[in-house]
Amino acid sequence: GIGAGFYLDAAQTPWRTHWRMESYLVQELLPLLAQHLPIDGERVGITGHSMGGHGALTLALRHPGRFKSLSAFAPICAPSQCPWGEKAFTGYLGADRTAWQEHDATVLMQNQPIAPYPGGILIDQGLADKFLAEQLHPHLFEAACQAIGQPLTLRRHADYDHGYYFVQTFVADHLRHHAQALL
């Protein structure tokens, strides 16, 4: 969409002054939730859908130890290699593609010295998703995980698209995945 923010802190004008989504989520929102809600701020998982799935993957990989479990639904796995990511990254980070690498889940996983989530990462992907081939690239993230020994369960579902019914169908599995890792 036109409001796609990609869960990063912008480096380009006019966005850089106020578009600080990564800082807001990690430095402000999570501590605020832990302070005001009866949750254990040390046992937090992260998940998301589509661009939110990209956010879950990149925030988890950019902030080692902050999130204890990780999952995603149809995430944008290699934004520096797809039109959505190229447009957003150019606008928020500039034309220098090296800056984009810091916000690309596939590149971030390739650069991990060891598997950051030994209990595994769960990703669900619909095979009828019209964005799969051009925008999402889960196969690239899968290869990056395999290269460093990161356990990944990438479930591919025939006849499921990119919509919320897809998420609704498998959200209980993601809740179980996080509960197992966090309890």
Q: Each PLM stretch: what is its role?
A:
Residues 1-183:
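Non-catalytic cap/lid and distal C-terminal segments of serine-dependent acyl enzymes
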